[in-house]
């Protein structure tokens, strides 16, 4: 791999579609190798835009806007960081040879749609999943929920971070769940997936790297499993490693390898799985760094962002664990623009702790504005430290 100089004819150019906190870390990792970074988002001042060489504000659900921007910037790689993207434009860009889409346009298109990835995993690949059905009206949702059985979960086929998700306890919940899903869905979607509830012991994210190896073939590397705790479909803390018994570990890696190889391309994938004893079920997969994987910034030899970048650039990867670690989310707490944070000196007094503030220009009470990270000799101590550090960071609304 030859890498030139940013802002020169020799530069390797990467365009990030989506410039949130995960994209910011990807941008920083890219810049360590002298890659020219172009950050794109729907609003100005997004986290990755603050560290990129250039930035653009566009409607990423507009195929024409995406196509025109790629033609203007001529990146070598287009790296999606979010789901709310006009994936048809990525297919056209890839087909025309304008840029390499990471991991590839088909993978991005399938994984941004819960119906696409569920049908691939369950019906084509034969992977174990929860029972499921799809619905595109309130009446169809009622029928699907009755078929799957109560309690069950309802999710828009296109959404992220828990948006639009509901737990249905009885038929009386259907209308509210349908309305909530329509409000939380993306790209004008009004279709939902109904999932049966699995009685699992815990959830994991198995960060899986698909990267070129000698001879040009793609090799697979696994990080240690990441455990996480969610509220309302969004993660609030994660830790690594999550202990699995040998049989469950073998099954988890087999499922992850199968789905990642089926998607193809190169990069890091966040494969979400349910685990109960020896049993493992596929849940979802993201073809990019995963929010629960932010813990790897203190736990691994190379964090998930570095692994993603190395896979993209064809560089050697090392997914080994160095030390148990944990992360805990820091929320906005208030609804305001340009908030401040207090208590960092107390947070960083926690042993082996770090804090990342994302720099998002606008806060909401439940918006993720930062994360506390901690390492320790044990996962339990790392979790305690991360939660303590996060609790000491206080968002403050600045008077106008």
From Swiss-Prot:
Binding site residues for N(1)-(5-phospho-beta-D-ribosyl)glycinamide: 21-22, 81, 291, 360, 367-368
Assembly mode: Homodimer.
Source organism: Methylococcus capsulatus (strain ATCC 33009 / NCIMB 11132 / Bath)
Alphabetic keyword roster: ATP-binding, Ligase, Magnesium, Metal-binding, Nucleotide-binding, Purine biosynthesis
InterPro entries registered for this protein in UniProt: ATP-grasp, ATP-grasp_carboxylate-amine, ATP_grasp_subdomain_1, PreATP-grasp_dom_sf, PurT, PurT/PurK_preATP-grasp, PurT_C, Rudment_hybrid_motif
Protein biosynthesis listed as a keyword: no
PROSITE patterns for this protein: ATP_GRASP
Residues given in the record as Mg(2+) binding sites: 272, 284
Enzyme kind, highest EC tier: ligase
Name of the protein: Formate-dependent phosphoribosylglycinamide formyltransferase
Top-rank taxon: Bacteria
Keyword match ATP-binding: yes
GO molecular function: ATP binding; magnesium ion binding; phosphoribosylglycinamide formyltransferase 2 activity; phosphoribosylglycinamide formyltransferase activity
């Amino acid at each position: 791999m030859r890498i030139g100089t940013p802002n020169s004819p020799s530069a390797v150019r990467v365009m990030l579609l989506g410039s949130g906190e995960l994209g910011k870390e990807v941008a920083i990792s890219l810049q360590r190798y002298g890659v020219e970074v172009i950050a794109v988002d729907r609003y100005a001042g997004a986290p990755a835009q603050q560290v990129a060489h250039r930035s653009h504000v566009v409607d990423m659900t507009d195929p024409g806007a995406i196509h025109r921007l790629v033609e203007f910037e001529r990146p070598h790689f287009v790296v999606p960081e979010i789901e709310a993207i006009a994936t048809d434009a990525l297919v056209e860009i890839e087909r025309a040879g304008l840029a390499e889409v990471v991991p590839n346009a088909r993978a991005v298109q399938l994984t941004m749609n819960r119906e696409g990835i569920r049908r691939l995993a369950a019906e084509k690949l034969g992977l174990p999943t929860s029972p499921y059905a799809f619905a595109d009206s309130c009446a169809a949702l009622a029928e699907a929920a009755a078929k799957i059985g109560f309690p069950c979960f309802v999710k828009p086929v296109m959404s992220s971070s828990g948006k639009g998700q509901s737990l249905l306890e009885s038929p009386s919940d259907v209308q509210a769940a349908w309305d909530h899903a329509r409000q939380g869905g993306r790209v004008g979607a009004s279709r939902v997936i109904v999932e049966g509830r699995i009685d699992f012991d815990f959830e994991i994210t198995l960060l899986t790297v698909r990267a070129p190896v000698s001879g040009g073939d793609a090799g697979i590397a696994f990080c240690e499993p990441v455990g996480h705790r969610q509220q309302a479909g969004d993660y609030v803390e994660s830790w690594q490693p999550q202990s699995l018994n040998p049989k469950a570990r073998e099954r988890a890696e087999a499922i992850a390898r199968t789905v990642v190889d089926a998607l193809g391309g190169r990069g890091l994938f966040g494969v979400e799985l349910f685990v109960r004893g020896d049993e493992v079920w596929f849940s979802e997969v993201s073809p990019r760094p995963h929010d629960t994987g932010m813990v790897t910034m203190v736990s691994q030899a190379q964090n998930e962002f570095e692994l993603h970048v190395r896979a993209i650039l064809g560089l050697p990867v090392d997914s080994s664990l160095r030390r148990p670690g944990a992360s805990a989310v820091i929320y906005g707490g208030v609804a305001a623009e340009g908030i401040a944070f207090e208590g960092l000196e107390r947070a960083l007094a926690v042993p082996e702790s770090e804090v990342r503030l994302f720099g998002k220009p606008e806060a909401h009470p439940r918006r993720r504005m930062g994360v506390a990270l901690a390492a320790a000799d044990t996962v339990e101590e790392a979790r305690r430290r991360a939660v303590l550090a996060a609790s000491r960071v206080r968002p403050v609304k600045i008077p106008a």
